[in-house]
Amino acid sequence: MTQDYRVLLYYQYVPIEDGETFAQKHLADCKELGLKGRILVADEGINGTVSGTIEQTNAYMELMKNDPRFSSTIFKIDEAEQNAFKKMHVRYRPELVNLSLEDDVNPLELTGAYLDPKEFREAMLDENTVVIDARNDYEFDLGHFRGAIRPEIRSFRELPQWIRDNKEQFMEKRVLTYCTGGIRCEKFSGWLVREGFKDVGQLHGGIATYGKDPEVQGDLWDGQMYVFDSRIAVPINQKEHVIVGRDWFDGSPCERYINCGNPECNRQMLASEENEAKYLGACSHECRVHPNNRYIKAHQLSNQEVQERLALLEKDLAS
């Protein structure tokens, strides 16, 4: 298939006066260009992922470059076979990333040392270095750097407390951190410095940049990179593909993400099509029998069919 579309991932920490008004105008500009995607605007900057044709994405990058505030913005570009989003959203938020800090960190004033892909790879090989994944748990489970630490957190804002609880393990080490495109690490690495960590580095441009580096070629990355659009997973390691994801239900190698059928749960989990059907698209018995189970509704299963599947599942689990 032809790769007629592109996906742009970018961010820029820069003061934006009257961010709410800017967000409204920026949405109109994006719609006029025919783009689809999701952009967050705050007084501290902008963070976005947009998709469109080559012409549309070129026009958008030109639009951004012509604004002095965004003239230095670095775009990570992926080719795609179709639009990665269905709609275009530009939303104003109090901050671009939420660390739930009483005293927020300004990355323009305080952040960890930037490491390019080659420097980051070399630093990972040093035995006195610890690598901390700054993403959510479900992102880590799909793919991560070899030997990286998986914080026991469900969301980014829980990370500072986890670090405080485990601080003694890392204080005397060189600490490296990474995330998808780099924006979360800008703030998180600055917070680590403020907390007293002596040697803090961050992967400049994130995993997305690391995977495209012609020299490093994604080396030491296992699995795939989770992305917040319809693609879900993007390959990073150009040298070898090691599957690290495990099926939620049986632990077998898996890189296929679904959301739990219970809309009140909505847990993201890895599952094969076979297991999704077997477990009615839900992570637990409580979610399987939830009256609003989306899997049951989407497949128009009758109550009798549901009860038959539940009985078979119960029998299988008991054996």
Curated annotation (Swiss-Prot):
SMART domains reported in the protein's UniProt record: RHOD
One Pfam family per UniProt: UPF0176_N
Active site as annotated: C179
Catalytic activity: uridine(34) in tRNA + AH2 + O2 = 5-hydroxyuridine(34) in tRNA + A + H2O
Family statement drawn from the similarity comment of this UniProt entry: Belongs to the TrhO family.
Record-annotated Rhodanese domain positions: 125-219
Organism annotation: Lactococcus lactis subsp. lactis (strain IL1403) (Streptococcus lactis)
GO biological process: tRNA modification
UniProt-recorded name of the protein: tRNA uridine(34) hydroxylase
CDD domains hit by this protein: RHOD_YceA
Superkingdom, taxonomy of origin: Bacteria
Alphabetical list of InterPro entries matching this protein: Rhodanese-like_dom, Rhodanese-like_dom_sf, Rhodanese_C, TrhO, TRHO_N
Keywords of this entry: Oxidoreductase, tRNA processing
